[in-house]
């Protein structure tokens, strides 16, 4: 099995992005699956293009995109991406779309095809804070997840894909308001590795209450 894992570059004035920093810490093989690591730009117009090129090149069995969700206290696999770009801040190219569709010919929303409940269960069993999320927002993270699932729907129906949001890394919390949630980078990476294991072990998601 081959799994592509992507993470974003820093944005919003940050000097690091825990998404790609954690992805870089992943081993090259997890549970027998080959791990391909990819950095994507935090740019509406370019992130999907970079990811699509990597998908076309490597033809992975599954794709896990990872992004930062500052303010969250747990690792949160996303269930759904919506066809909406509505940015509260500019991306790294200065683009700030308002109420724009990501794909004019796309569905209103796409659901993840990753075993997100199994991911959460596996991380929690290891003592890592994790929870399902039902909103990927409307910034570049949601845009990338939507673009991936659109690509899978149109071209790669056997491929599985989705998105995971991670908290701030601890080194980012120093200049944030007191009490801002953060997580140690190695713990984030451990959580992502367990999420990958869940993908390898579960062709379909668990049927359990969240």
What spans do the regions from the language model cover?
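C-terminal folded domains that constitute the principal catalytic or ligand-binding module
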Residues: 124, 148, 160-161, 166-173
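Short, solvent-exposed polar/charged micro-motifs at secondary-structure junctions
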Residues: 47-49, 142-143, 173
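Hydrophobic, aromatic-enriched interface-forming segments
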Residues: 142-150
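Short acidic, glycine/proline-rich loop/turn micro-motifs
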Residues: 174-178
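N-terminal catalytic or cofactor-binding beta/alpha core of small enzyme domains
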Residues: 1-136, 149-158, 180-191, 196-210
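Small/polar glycine-rich anion-binding or flexible loop at a beta-alpha turn
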Residues: 137-141, 166-168
